[in-house]
Amino acid sequence: MQDFVHLHVHTQYSLLDGQASVSRLVDKAMKDGMKGIAVTDHGNMFGIKEFTNYVNKKNSGPKGEIKDLKKRIAGIESGEIECEDKEAEIADCRAKMAEAESKLFKPIVGCEMYVARRTMDKKEGKPDQSGYHLIVLAKNEKGYHNLIKLVSHAWTRGYYMRPRTDRSELEKYHEGLIVCSACIGGEVPKKIINDQLEEAEEAVRWYKNLFGDDYYLELQRHKATVPRANHEAYPLQQKANAKLLELARKYDIKVICSNDVHFVDEENAEAHDRLICLSTGKDLDDPTRMLYTKQEWMKTKAEMNALFEDVPEALSNTLEILDKVEYYSIDHAPIMPTFAIPEDFGTEEGYRQKYTEKDLFDEFTQDENGKVVLDEDAANAKIKRLGGYDKLYRIKLEADYLAKLAFDGAKKLYGDPLSDEVKERLVFELYIMKTMGFPGYFLIVQDFINAARTQLGVSVGPGRGSAAGSAVAYCLGITKIDPIQYDLLFERFLNPDRISLPDIDVDFDDDGRGEVLRWVTEKYGQEKVAHIITYGTMATKMAIKDVARVQKLPLSESDRLCKLVPDKIPDKKLNLPNAIAYVPELQAAEASPDPLVRDTMKYAKMLEGNVRGTGVHACGTIICRDDITDWVPVSTADDKETGEKMLVTQYEGSVIEDTGLIKMDFLGLKTLSIIKEAVANVRLHRGLELDIDKISISDPATYKLYCDGRTIGTFQFESAGMQKYLRELQPSTFEDLIA
């Protein structure tokens, strides 16, 4: 039997078209002994980060073994580890390493792209509405970044019904990429089927000239075996396959086979069929609706060998592609945006002349009092983690400017000269910020907060969460709460023992939030600022309703089934299998004599949790040092406020920071808008200019309102439960409220 890997695979991130979860695909491939798979969703890279993360998790065991064996070999070679026969021991370690490496599963990052029939800037009617399919795989890190560019530009420049690229873009970003001719929607197969043989050959020559041995012709065989399926595709595939094999011989191009995977197992075909009904807005019994062949499951190596036993090289060539693909990481250390520091304060070039690498080594590896606290190995590891000496000059410049701003602000707040307590607190916090590599983050946050207050007239909240524990944040104007007065812990906010990016949630009045984001976009550049994508999944009740609708289950019965689903299940996650186990009526529905009810439950279980659509994170925004598409793929979404297109990362918020991008949270708070409006009303009707930040927080009349529970509209004190406790506890000081 020939070895084989799948190179044309759609996950659930091929929205309402793929029905396969990343984890199930990887698990099945590994169980079948495959050495890797590709993920090639339609026009996007939404699932790539989840894919690489899951594979890394699966590979953690063998990677740990390899790391330990390398360490042992180094120890033997240096003499730190003694053994009787060094050569034999090292040979044994290398053999074990080879065995561990053979267990590694390789993730291949890819995308099934749409190539415009003309050029991606043409957007005129039916000829430009779609495009030819093309499988594009990243061979290495360079290829990954080129794929990001292609996919991002397809959204931002080429979108017309679908995200489209074109030949010009492929020429520009072809390095490090492998391409395959795709399904019968691909340019070459489509032209063969349409008897445009000269045009098909022209396309083959063009791709061969550009990609050389990294261009492959792709064979597929989807012979439908059930009545309600697409029986027209297979004859077309066979027509295309015959000519593709002929062209492969003529132009010395290798062929591969694929199965255009859209679901995991054969028994998922009917669930996938219902998903396509949802996607196309058709009922299951509609005779005109779109049908798949129902052969598009992740077939095993044995099943693929049976399909292509007459073309064994099409199977083995998939391993050639796998071997071409390198292991690389798509994660990155934090990529801090560049804050423009006044030149009269200092420049990187000036700092390079002023400070030696030894100066930087001492400053970044000693404590805030100049004491040596790290051994040489740990110190060098820290320098490396911060990006090396080249990066340290920038960090030091930002840290020094941050210190200047912090101490200037401290003198205004605490008076001059500063007390020893304040100085010690600021020196300690600034040291942590500097040696963790984050001074630029605080410069940027204070910049847009001060711009909101002084330039844009936007109300800014006093601070929330752990950032309120930072005296530096207080002195910069990021927060309005004195952490020294209220004995708030800085270590809850930043802790060198827990390396993670700072997280400052900033509240703006909800009318002004958009203005602040526009200011940030203009300052840092439209290509460097993006919102963060979210994925909407089919929840339990939604899955039932969706399947019921396409199957024409009466609405009353659909509603009845949904009402049987509990809001929560004791000690268990709420999902349909757990709900069925918990609710006898749902068990009865699952075994119902009515096939419509029974099938609704059966396929709702399969579709539950499937990604249904995308959205935009309510407050998360990326500000990047570079064009964001240098690091992650972007798509577009409509700005609800302006109707304009805005950039959105294709990786969601829980993983985006792994790639090095810096997330800032811009929250819109209605409470701030209410306060702003109240101040304006006082000015209008009383002629008084109020500064909300200077109103005393010790006003007895205000505490009387709290004690009476009259706090509707007061942020975090307006719920019925809070009002009840306020009446019971009778707070009389600010410390009572924050206890």
Regions found by a protein language model. Give the residues of each.
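Alpha-helical scaffold/interaction cores of sigma-54-like transcription cofactors
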Residues: 1-739
